[in-house]
Amino acid sequence: VVAIIGPSGSGKSTFLRCLNCMEDPTGGQIIFNGVDIADPKVDINIHRRHMGMVFQHFNLYNNKTVIQNIMLAPVLVRCQDLKKAKRHNRMLPLTNLFRKEKQEKIEITTSKSQIVAEARAKAEELLKRIGLEDKADVYPSTLSGGQKQRVAIIRALAMNPDVILFDEPTSALDPEMVGEVLDLMKDLAKEGMTMIVVTHEMGFAKEVANKVLFIDEGQILETGTPEEFFGNPKNPRLKDFLSKVL
């Protein structure tokens, strides 16, 4: 778990969005699963399947029910793969006429109805995990802020990501709602989920993070373990920042 802290406007959220290529970095590399995903030649959508993101303001679709929000990405991605496989098989006799090395037919072992059924079962399982199974068929507008953010987190989990990016997941919540979201994130950390978290929750960073980064004016000024970072900060700007927030 990597926690990213810093003053408002320092570039924390921009840094996170660059990791998911929602904003184009101006230089450098972003290596994810051995691939530089900042390379324009790389299909970023393939890698986004393995990188979940949770936003400050939840970003749930208000015109879809809770369970439809959770099912949307898994169904869309798997149906796209199914469509590509069917198209490949349909065109195979023609394309093999012009190839020395013949391609094989793709074995199709699923259907759209099966994909939807499996996604719904997974969504129901995730809702049960956070105690919101009774909210499956309601719309996000009926949920509290804490409930919306927990739904947003399990929506990211529905894709079985390798890493989840959290952009200030508690900053838009009432203080009494913060605990339920942090508890879920702590559970994910205990289960070994890789997380990069932009946060103002210093207690969470101290307790859960393996590494803490301090960003100011778009620069990473200091990194370290929570013990080093909070107990013996070296950068003067970080010392000043911590003196105001702790």
What annotation goes with each model-predicted range?
Residues 164-167:
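Catalytic Walker B motif of ABC-type/P-loop ATPase nucleotide-binding domains
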Residues 138, 159, 191:
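Conserved signature/switch motifs of ABC ATPase nucleotide-binding domains
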Residues 37-52, 76, 112-121, 229-233:
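ABC ATPase NBD coupling module
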Residues 28-39, 87:
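Conserved ABC transporter NBD signature motif
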Residues 139-143, 147:
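Conserved ABC ATPase signature
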